[in-house]
UniProtKB/Swiss-Prot annotation:
One Pfam family linked to the record: AMP-binding_C
Known catalytic reactions: holo-[D-alanyl-carrier protein] + D-alanine + ATP = D-alanyl-[D-alanyl-carrier protein] + AMP + diphosphate
Pathway(s) per entry: Cell wall biogenesis; lipoteichoic acid biosynthesis
Origin species: Bacillus thuringiensis (strain Al Hakam)
Function as written in the Swiss-Prot or TrEMBL entry: Catalyzes the first step in the D-alanylation of lipoteichoic acid (LTA), the activation of D-alanine and its transfer onto the D-alanyl carrier protein (Dcp) DltC. In an ATP-dependent two-step reaction, forms a high energy D-alanyl-AMP intermediate, followed by transfer of the D-alanyl residue as a thiol ester to the phosphopantheinyl prosthetic group of the Dcp. D-alanylation of LTA plays an important role in modulating the properties of the cell wall in Gram-positive bacteria, influencing the net charge of the cell wall.
Any Gene Ontology biological process: lipoteichoic acid biosynthetic process
This protein's name: D-alanine--D-alanyl carrier protein ligase
SUPFAM superfamilies assigned to the protein according to its UniProt record, in alphabetical order: Acetyl-CoA synthetase-like
Cellular component GO terms held in the UniProt record: cytoplasm
Amino acid sequence: MKLLEQIEKWAIETPDQTAFVWRDAKITYKQLKEDSDALAHWISSEYPDDRSPIMVYGHMQPEMIINFLGCVKAGHAYIPVDLSIPADRVQRIAENSGAKLLLSAAAVTVTDLPVRIVSEDNLKDIFFTHKGNTPNPEHAVKGDENFYIIYTSGSTGNPKGVQITYNCLVSFTQWAVEDFNLQTGQVFLNQAPFSFDLSVMDIYPSLVTGGTLWAIDKDMIARPKDLFASLEQSDIQVWTSTPSFAEMCLMEASFSESMLPNMKTFLFCGEVLPNEVARKLIERFPKATIMNTYGPTEATVAVTGIHVTEEVLDQYKSLPVGYCKSDCRLLIMKEDGTIAPDGEKGEIVIVGPSVSVGYLGSPELTEKAFTMIDGERAYKTGDAGYVENGLLFYNGRLDFQIKLHGYRMELEEIEHHLRACSYVEGAVIVPIKKGEKYDYLLAVVVPGEHSFEKEFKLTSAIKKELNERLPNYMIPRKFMYQSSIPMTPNGKVDRKKLLSEVTA
């Protein structure tokens, strides 16, 4: 598959087909090509001998997609940066990435960034003044050059830039289109922010098949009336989200085939798909196919998939996450470094062309997590699991990294920033489960000196500081105050004891 050519052919074959819809804003495939060509031409003229990554800032605006393609046509990887990301984190991404340019689809509220900022109005001028110019196709990202870089949570308190190459993305997109039986011209739900790699599961499968991306933003999700009004208008056929989002939608009785009569495929990734959620979806959407998938950001969205049928639901209380895509393989490694036999638990290691080339500017972290096996890139996921007859079963994290509502995060990163807050002497983050998956974060805090008469005022002050350093989804929902943190005999935090205390 030639990814960019495959997207561009729709500008010729179906130029007036809508490529992307967000609220009242939409773009056609013709506009997508013209504007991304104009932007790529401008980037190449301004930065002729430069291939540094470009930050793309915004939320669900159509210009985000234009900017992504404009960057890669000019030979630059893009770094999606959502509006919700705190200023301090945006600053660290800018510094770590070496980006020189930020393209903005929304007002940039972050100050003192070490990059040139192209505003919304500047972008419109570029689209207009460079219209009709086409970039040199030889300049476009290709092969093992980075296509995008997504920053994920890092245990040192600094985010890690996962580098995904053109070849990685082609491998994923081709597999997704074929294995999920995606058809030409379908409407895809775009629910995940672009800084979250789940969004890649809908963006590129939609664009290469001439589909329409129907974007749901965070304000809609916070207002169910607006959300379901949008869904009713959408005629979505391919649903891509975390299981949590679908579970929330199922709380609305009208969320069914009557609301979305042409629903064909549910694609789930990012967290555990509960058996009962899949069962309800089959009841509400009897004609739709439900696919459960698995994969970390470092292996390009997902590398396994399984069609969840009623037979699968009856056979497995905890659902398997699927069979590996044909160009990759899974190894289950025991602690001694040997390969575990069928049915035995160990660390999931992914081998093949889906695997990232590593973390940008972080050779030590890259060496720790990535290796070569039989001449192919391999990623040590830190996930526990086992394989039985080719089917992968996921058993949670081996370390303190978790997925909460689809967002992957390092508990140590949150603890790092929490301990840096005023009024905090010590802190541990405890993820609280509801059934099979994590429901919320609890912060166990040893407070320092403070003058607050009520605990809720202390909590408000700590949360205010955290909001300046971490995304909202990493802020603990509840706080518990103790005089000390329990320790193990070897001097480490006794997390098991702490969990038993807080859940007793």
